[in-house]
Amino acid sequence: MSNDANVSKRDGFRSRGGFIIACIGSAVGMGNIWRFPTLVSKWGGMTFLLPYFLFVILIGSTGVIGEFALGRAAGAGPVDAFGMCTEARWGKRRPGELVGYIPVLGSLALAIGYTCVMGWIFKYTFLAFDGGLSAMGQDMDGIVATFNATASAWGANVWVVVAVAVSFVIMSFGIAGGIEKANKIMMPILFLLFVGLGIYVATLPGASDGYRYIFTIKPAGLLDPYVWIYAFGQAFFSLSVAGNGSVIYGSYLSKSECIPSSARNVALFDTIAALLAAFVIIPAMAAGGAQLDAGGPGLMFIYLVHVMNGMAGGRIVARVFFVCVAFAGVTSIINLYEAPVASLQERFGLKRVPATAVIHVIGLAVALCIQAIVSQWMDVVSIYICPLGALLAAVMFFWIGGKKLVLESVNLGARKPIGGWYYPLCKYVYCASVLVALVAGAALGGIG
């Protein structure tokens, strides 16, 4: 709940740096690795990056700040945060609390789908170290068959269990002792390893063609509305505005911390991570003589495996790459499971470990059953439920909560208070953009 007595009992981040790193960890995920480079390649390098940067600035300075501030103001996850907003407007918490379960369930659904993907990632990380990946060589039929078997019904049971176990262990130690500590270890290593991969790939013959393409801008391409739509979609989903993860992490933030500054850092480092992935994958594909025309799991588990097996030092590259992917996945999945875990604690008074166990048992049971349809599962969640959660959070905070609550919440602890421009920008421009994400995603079969 959001009263002071209960807030004081809650776990939280020990430091501003820990909060920022954890939020970066939640944002840096598969979208940065298997979707962003594909979009950069498909839509013309810098032609795509320019609108992408603009949308990162817009969403980072509106939605990310807003969700952090909403969570901190309530001192709770989406259920109580939405209840706080309806109470501020109408004196009734119940309507907001009921609506707040939508993004919580969305977070759980996305976490379950992610659990399946993490099973694949752990399996391929193991194969990279035991020689299984390199043994396939460049036999595309064998590479495809291995992935198809992995992504089939009951195809990665052991590794799905491993994924759930890793998440459960980290989260059982709480926010400071588990989530913050894990992110402080994994995120710096991820960035360092990606930089190392980028340096190595840059030395490969033919890699320069990939870099040249990334930095090419075609002015005519900027007139294509689809470039802007997909750039917006990628920025929107990459920054993890969905009314759940950012809200719950914000609820653990000290009231003395500067939220606008934290949001800027999250947006900056998420973008750096995405660019690092592009600077590794696009030149690597160019060096391997392959075209980057397929995104999603196929890029990571089929085409990149084929390319890495054909390059000098490919066995080492594969090991480093899949460790990076595993770290990105773990730091994202613990954020996705946190909102439902925290909701059990807040609504039913469960202790941390039992609440974590209940959610992870549910996650494991469903994940094992949906392995063959996880792509369709993730499409439904990401196209409809996540944007809906973001829209509900935006409407609750900026429309129902009202200007006074918004500005007080955002400026609490701010080194330089945000001016009057922030509220109308969020209320009208940001809320409208979230609605666009929902409608465009439904119309185009996903934009992020």
Task: Give, region by region, the residue ranges found by the protein language model.
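Hydrophobic alpha-helical segments of multi-pass membrane transport proteins
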Residues: 327-336, 355-366, 382-409
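Loop-to-transmembrane helix boundary motifs in multi-pass membrane proteins
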Residues: 18-19, 26, 157-158, 269-275, ...
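Helix-loop-helix connectors at the membrane interface of multi-pass transporters/channels
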Residues: 2, 118-151, 252-256, 261, ...
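Inter-helical loop and helix-membrane interface segments of multi-pass membrane transporters/permeases
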Residues: 7-11, 39-43, 73-102, 115-176, ...
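Hydrophobic, membrane-embedded alpha-helices of multi-pass small-molecule transporters
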Residues: 14, 21-31, 107-111, 115, ...
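Membrane-embedded translocation segments of transport machinery
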Residues: 2-13, 180, 184-330, 354
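Membrane-interface "cap" regions at the ends of multi-pass membrane proteins
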Residues: 1-34, 63-68, 72-98, 254-258, ...
